[in-house]
Design a protein with these regions (language model features):
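N-terminal organellar transit peptides
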Residues: 1-56, 60-178
Length: 178
């Protein structure tokens, strides 16, 4: 969070974030997500190795999402440990439902632009249901880099036309501003 704010204050150059993440805490991840969405600079997110759980949500905030050819992408409901009184557990379960809805909103909004869902002329509701069905099938929905692009979770695989390397991505972004 501090680094994004520092780089934003330093100028309007694109910010390139490299991430390898098997996941993490919901609140901390959403803090990063919010910082990215509020940043005035163009943010490019490059996923390496694994983008799982919260590590697959955070990149959705970026302006450009690139995945490395061998990076794995995974979405799921996450895990929860509940402890406390009956009412506290009920309250926590209700919060989990709200977080799930927020996660589905984020994924559905980006997936609508994916080749798979454009071909199907999908709606927000049908995309949400598709994602729910995939998670219900196996709990964890794993995708390779090409599948992540096809479903709209990422914009391109590094090495694709126009995304040959990080420098070419930087050039594209800089030319957009001219």
């Amino acid at each position: 969070l501090k680094n994004i704010r520092f780089l934003e204050a330093a100028g309007d150059d694109p910010i390139i974030v490299h991430q390898h993440s098997i996941g993490g805490d919901w609140a901390e991840g959403m803090m990063i997500y919010d910082a990215i969405t509020q940043c005035q600079c163009h943010i490019v997110f490059v996923m390496h190795g694994a983008a799982c759980s919260m590590g697959s949500i955070i990149p959705q905030a970026a302006d450009t999402r690139i995945i490395m050819p061998n990076c794995l992408f995974m979405i799921h409901d996450g895990s929860t440990n509940l402890d406390g009184t009956h009412k506290q557990v009920q309250s926590a379960a209700q919060l989990e439902e709200k977080m799930r809805d927020q996660m589905l909103d984020i994924y559905a909004s980006v997936c609508l632009n994916g080749h798979y869902f454009q071909k199907e002329q999908a709606t927000d509701k049908s995309v949400r249901q598709y994602i729910i069905n995939r998670m219900n099938e196996k709990e964890d929905w794993w995708l390779n880099a090409r599948e992540a692009v096809a479903f709209g979770f990422t914009d391109a695989v590094l090495g694709d036309e126009g995304y040959d390397n990080i420098d070419s991505i930087r050039d594209i972004i800089n030319n957009e501003g001219e």
